[in-house]
Amino acid sequence: MIFWLILCISTTFSGEITISIKKSTGKTCTVKENKVILQQQIPPRFPFEQRTRAELRFYRDMDYTKNALDYTQILTQLKARGLLFKDEERAVEVLANISYFRIANYLRYFEIDNDRHLYKPDTYFEDAVYIYYFDKKLRGLLFTAIQSIEVSLRSKVIHHVALSHGPFWFADYNLCINRAMYADNLTTIKREVQRSKEDFIQEHFRKYSYPDVPPVWKTLEVTSFGTLSKLFCNLNDNRVKKQIARLYNLPQHQVLESWIKCIVILRNCLAHHARVWNRRFPQMPQLSIRARGNWIDSTHVRPNKLYAQICCLAYLLDSIYPQNDFKVQVKNLLNEYPDINIHYMGFPNDWENQPLWM
């Protein structure tokens, strides 16, 4: 077999050589005393940080030498990079209450040089603040929707799986697909239960000594959404999983699994107040489905963008609460912020004409 490698070599002050292997793994390794030590994989950059220089570059060990700046110094630095301000006093208030680095996540959208952080002509600090407040309201809207879906899914998983496999099915390795994941899940469940301060958990342990975890209807009320997702996906009873999926008007449990995995990642972003409006998500929902309810034409939908996940949330909410106003709230928010470029969120041109949104 013929293959090729391109190596980037740089030296450190200690004489070590860092080699970046271009083709094979995308990982770096260090050559020291004729021994090659593999280091961690270089993480991918956010979409708005795509480099304009050649992809092949030198990686060096560097010391971080930047000092903290006061608000006036931050404004001076941003001005030197080409950023404009409509109200500098208000800008200082924003930095004091939101922090520069959080706003910088939105300023990067306006950069023309990601290495030197130079901004497009006629870019104002307030432009980034505008997107920040839109993103903040959007996060609140999505988080509320996910709460309803999470509570519903917990209830259905607890009820239907327990009826088929008993109150401690999550501790039965015969019901899992992957034994290693089963062990990890059980360890996580026990840890989450032990640290819970809920009265019903404390009361359970005062009354019962065996098994060492409460039944599923208590346990799954104090475990994380991520743990719930892993338990459901690792369950080997496809009949029960399909039964639950059909309660959400989904034809296959694999579709529900793919949606839940995406929603867990989205929820974590929301819980940590992370930017979501133009994020590319690593987990993508299955969109080409034979839906029983009103759905979308997914032909031109980018599954790694937020619009795809918003559609999944809307569809699930319609099955849980048919009279919900989630879609109305989404439209109202977009109307409130007309200058937001919704294409960066993955919205297609005809999204409002899709059956789901009509």
Task: Mark where each language-model region is.
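Compositionally biased, low-complexity peptide segments typical
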Residues: 20-26
